[in-house]
């Protein structure tokens, strides 16, 4: 090897070695091209089902009593969990403050917050999809009474 480098430096090279190397590399490429697709290594293939099963969606039910409980609700949203929040056991002023805090959290995460009942809200992270309206059902119930 050292002699080859020295020979190339002075412009003297052994062309026979280069020809053998070229023939070897071209024949190797031809062999790889003729292999069937089934014999190719599949180390980088992952089942889609295994990825779906690892991420389970959860919905957390929460009844805050004080303003500091808003941090727990926000933490659940950060952990990609939807949260149903019932404010029936809180004063309206404290409930408004928590709704404002959670609205900011949801906005920062690109999620959604929806009113689903009297003093009940649903806050969802961005990967959750909600469909339909409960308010239509509540209006029909009021008309029946």
Curated annotation (Swiss-Prot):
- Identify the domain of life: Bacteria
Q: Where in the cell is it found?
A: Cytoplasm
Family stated for the protein in its record? Belongs to the SepF family.
- Keywords, comma-separated and alphabetical: Cell cycle, Cell division, Cytoplasm, Septation
GO cellular component entries: cytoplasm
Taken from the record, one Pfam family name reads: SepF
Q: Name the encoding gene, please.
A: sepF
Transmembrane helix among keywords = no
Protein name per UniProt: Cell division protein SepF
Identify the stretch annotated as signal peptide in this record: none
Main function:
Cell division protein that is part of the divisome complex and is recruited early to the Z-ring. Probably stimulates Z-ring formation, perhaps through the cross-linking of FtsZ protofilaments. Its function overlaps with FtsA.
Subunit details: Homodimer. Interacts with FtsZ.
Q: Which GO terms describe its biological process?
A: division septum assembly; FtsZ-dependent cytokinesis
